[in-house]
A protein has these predicted regions:
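Sec-dependent signal peptide recognition
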Residues: 3-10
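Hydrophobic h-region of N-terminal signal peptides that target proteins for export
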Residues: 11-19
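Cyclophilin-like peptidyl-prolyl cis-trans isomerases
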Residues: 19-225
Length: 225
């Protein structure tokens, strides 16, 4: 009888272990259940979804994840374009091709050198282009990269497509000239790591810093895992 009880206890424990596995990365815990992958970061839990929500997960190779919130009420054209690219799995296996400590880290170029983008350019949503945008370029802000010129032209003001940057340290002098559209709400430690890597004379990291993908997420509202 005792042996039977021992076997039952072991079987129950095994089921519990199989039912919910935990993996630890640099800045998050991955809870694996039978049908869900739950990402816990800074006390919040998120699950991936095919729904185009206003929350996205940036999976950075070796370092962990960032969770960012998008603001369609501030930059509707920019957010719509960003969501469409995510839905097409556009942002898979890109590098952060431009990194400047205390300024920003930039990605989203399929060429990996700052010359490329997606097939469609969008209207620049910022005051220099006649659009109100009150999201400031403070630490953690997501904003669209674009071509520049002196003087600016209609072409350069509306040249953003897929490249974007994450502000490392407050850079409010960019306000009014670039389309800010979101903010990192969890995972700025990953931005700090990338911002401090060695770069060459073109501000490109000596060792590739890889963005594995960007996916939509939503807050996990289930019970205890």
């Amino acid at each position: 009888m005792k042996n039977i009880l021992k076997i039952l206890v072991v079987a129950i424990i095994s089921l519990l272990v199989v039912g919910c596995k935990e993996e630890y990365s640099l800045n998050y815990i991955l809870h694996q259940t039978d049908n869900l992958s739950i990402y816990e970061i800074e006390g919040k839990k998120y699950v991936e979804t095919t729904e185009a929500t206003n929350y996205v997960k940036l999976d950075v190779d070796k370092y962990g994840i960032l969770i960012a919130e998008l603001y369609p009420e501030i930059a509707p054209i920019t957010v719509k374009n960003f969501k469409e690219l995510i839905s097409k799995n556009f942002y898979n296996n890109f590098i952060f091709h431009r990194v400047i400590k205390d300024f920003m880290i930039q990605t989203g170029d399929p060429n990996g050198d700052g010359t490329g983008g997606s097939s469609e350019e969008i209207k620049g949503e910022f005051s220099a282009n006649g659009v109100i945008n009150d999201l400031s370029h403070v630490r953690g802000t997501l904003s669209m990269a674009r071509r520049g010129a002196v003087p600016e032209t209609e072409e350069t003001l509306n040249s953003a497509s897929s490249q974007f940057f994450i502000v490392h340290a407050d850079s409010t002098y960019l306000d009014g000239n670039y389309a800010a559209f979101g903010s990192v709400i969890h995972g700025m430690d990953v931005v700090d790591i990338i911002a401090n890597v060695s770069t060459d004379s073109y501000d490109k990291p000596v060792i590739d810093q890889i963005l594995n993908n960007i996916t939509f997420v939503k807050e996990y509202t289930g019970g205890e895992i």
